[in-house]
Regions:
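Charge-rich amphipathic alpha-helical interaction elements
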Residues: 1-125
Length: 125
């Protein structure tokens, strides 16, 4: 499947913005986890805190991976435009379907983690 260069570039920029938002969200979530940690010493709470800390680390790593892939896609689009600038906004390129799927999967998993953390915090704060 093909997509216009302009449209794919715009979508990649949107993915970059989303990843920046999720990075900020992770910082907020880490702060909340630390807050719960400082107020509770129960074994059950400690185990869940460790779980959330590990999950947030994994999600941060995944954000870094996705950001790198998005940047590579943008660089490839820009290189294609520089190589042949004639009618660049009307040309089509191979769509980034796999990358789009990766972003969507990340968002689904991240949002599930966020809901799980909110439920946990409601119980222990």
């Amino acid at each position: 499947m093909e997509k216009k260069i302009y449209d794919l570039n715009l979508e990649c920029r949107e993915w970059q913005n989303k990843m920046a938002f999720y990075e900020d969200d992770i910082k907020i979530m880490q702060g909340r986890v630390e807050e719960v940690n400082s107020k509770n010493s129960a074994t059950e709470v400690r185990a869940m805190i460790e779980h959330f800390q590990n999950q947030l680390i994994l999600q941060k790593e995944q954000i870094d991976i996705v950001k790198k892939k998005v940047k590579q896609q943008i660089n490839a689009l820009e290189a294609g435009i520089e190589k042949n600038p004639v009618a660049a906004d009307h040309r089509s390129v191979e769509d980034a379907t796999a990358l789009r799927d990766e972003v969507e999967t990340f968002e689904k998993i991240f949002n599930e983690l966020r809901k799980e953390l909110i439920t946990f915090m409601a119980k222990w704060m």
